[in-house]
């Protein structure tokens, strides 16, 4: 090997050695199985893959939302017609007639609920607001005793509530805003059955998600304040598998539906969720009569079976008694809100 080639050979060898050292350092820096890093399970790997796909499709989802907004805008424009002057174009709307009936959600039970239930109440209020905005006969909507956890949750998760229209959101108690003689508290514990709605009155719905921890509380409050109270005529038209306590938004929507149809049974069956197992009272009576006949036919057995037959009849009379005491009357379903 000549003396001229020797420096080049030495320089090349040094470069190779440096590259080898760097590769060794990189390998040593990688986490090894069993050395401070646990192996990734298949489930974790799937989650990571899904997360990566979600991030990669972010722009695609954004584009789809943009296209959806454009499509809805075009649909709205197609529903427009020129006015008598021929200048502006107005949306073709149904004939909306505002009701004079005042419907109040009483939020004075804030201190009795945990945060999870506060969030459920917030969603139910959102649903009430959305349904009232699209109703044919919207009511005069009031939210009273607004504050505490509920207001904080709305401030954090739904800042747009300050721009809601056609709603009176007040920190005061409803008794400070409306005359006592105009108030009717809607509570399932009241012995009074509501036959029809008086649109000159103000009906109060208890804003309480209690999971049956505070039975009779709204009825007690109405009695303590000395205001009228009543319950919806649910038992006159509907037989349910569960207790007659309904979620705030269900009561609200039933009243909106009744104002449109003036038919309690239609209002109940339009609004009540299927999980309630609601059937018309006449069909429920026919079913009960058929069951009783079946029991009587079986009573022709020996006397030793009489105790079992009596137990069977008791079960038929109240098959859902335990379920009624345990069922939670709330529902978290939320629509996007118009502002």
UniProtKB/Swiss-Prot annotation:
Its main location: nucleus. One of its GO terms (molecular function) is tRNA (guanosine(9)-N1)-methyltransferase activity. Interacts with tRNA. GO terms for biological process: tRNA methylation; tRNA N1-guanine methylation. The modification Phosphoserine is found at residue 336. Residues 14-35, 310-330 have a biased composition (Basic and acidic residues). This is tRNA methyltransferase 10 homolog A. Its EC number is 2.1.1.221. It is found in: Nucleus; Nucleus, Nucleolus. It catalyses: guanosine(9) in tRNA + S-adenosyl-L-methionine = N(1)-methylguanosine(9) in tRNA + S-adenosyl-L-homocysteine + H(+). Residues 52-81 form a coiled coil. It comes from Homo sapiens (Human). Keywords: Coiled coil, Diabetes mellitus, Disease variant, Dwarfism, Intellectual disability, Methyltransferase, Nucleus, Phosphoprotein, S-adenosyl-L-methionine, Transferase. PANTHER family: TRNA (GUANINE-9-) METHYLTRANSFERASE, TRNA METHYLTRANSFERASE 10 HOMOLOG A. It is linked to Microcephaly, short stature, and impaired glucose metabolism 1: An autosomal recessive disease characterized by microcephaly, intellectual disability, short stature, and disturbed glucose metabolism. Additional clinical features include delayed puberty, hypoglycemia-related seizures, hyperinsulinemic hypoglycemia, and early-onset diabetes. One of its GO terms (cellular component) is nucleus. Residues 61-74 have a biased composition (Basic residues). Changing residue 206 to R: In MSSGM1; results in loss of activity; does not affect affinity for Gly-tRNA.
């Amino acid at each position: 090997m000549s003396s001229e080639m020797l420096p080049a050979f030495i320089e090349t060898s040094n470069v190779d050695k440096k590259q080898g050292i760097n590769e060794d350092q990189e390998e040593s820096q990688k986490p090894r199985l069993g050395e401070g890093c646990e192996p990734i399970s298949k489930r974790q790997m799937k989650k990571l893959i899904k997360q990566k796909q979600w991030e990669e499709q972010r722009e695609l989802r954004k584009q789809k939302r943009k296209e959806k907004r454009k499509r809805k805008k075009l649909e709205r424009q197609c529903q427009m017609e020129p006015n008598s002057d021929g200048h502006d174009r107005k949306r073709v709307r149904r004939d909306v007639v505002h009701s004079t009936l005042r419907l109040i959600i009483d939020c004075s039970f804030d201190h009795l609920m945990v945060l999870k239930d506060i969030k459920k109440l917030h969603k139910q209020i959102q649903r009430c607001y959305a349904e009232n905005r699209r109703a044919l006969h919207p009511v005069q909507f009031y939210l009273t005793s607004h504050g505490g956890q509920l207001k904080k949750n709305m401030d954090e998760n739904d800042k747009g509530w300050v721009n809601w229209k056609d709603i009176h959101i007040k920190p005061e108690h409803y008794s400070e805003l409306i005359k006592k003689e105009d108030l009717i508290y809607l509570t399932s514990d009241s012995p009074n059955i509501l036959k029809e709605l008086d649109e000159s009155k103000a009906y109060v719905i208890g804003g309480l998600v209690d999971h049956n921890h505070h039975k009779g509380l709204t009825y007690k409050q109405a009695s303590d304040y000395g205001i009228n109270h009543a319950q919806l005529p649910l038992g006159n038209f509907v037989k349910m598998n569960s207790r007659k306590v309904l979620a705030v938004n269900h009561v609200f929507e039933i009243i909106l539906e009744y104002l449109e149809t003036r038919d309690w049974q239609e209002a109940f069956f339009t609004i009540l969720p299927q999980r309630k197992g609601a059937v018309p009272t006449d069909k429920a009576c026919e079913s009960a009569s058929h069951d009783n006949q079946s029991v009587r036919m079986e009573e022709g057995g020996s006397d030793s079976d009489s105790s079992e037959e009596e137990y069977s009849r008791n079960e038929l009379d109240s098959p859902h008694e335990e379920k009624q005491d345990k069922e939670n009357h709330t529902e978290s379903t939320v629509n996007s809100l118009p502002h």
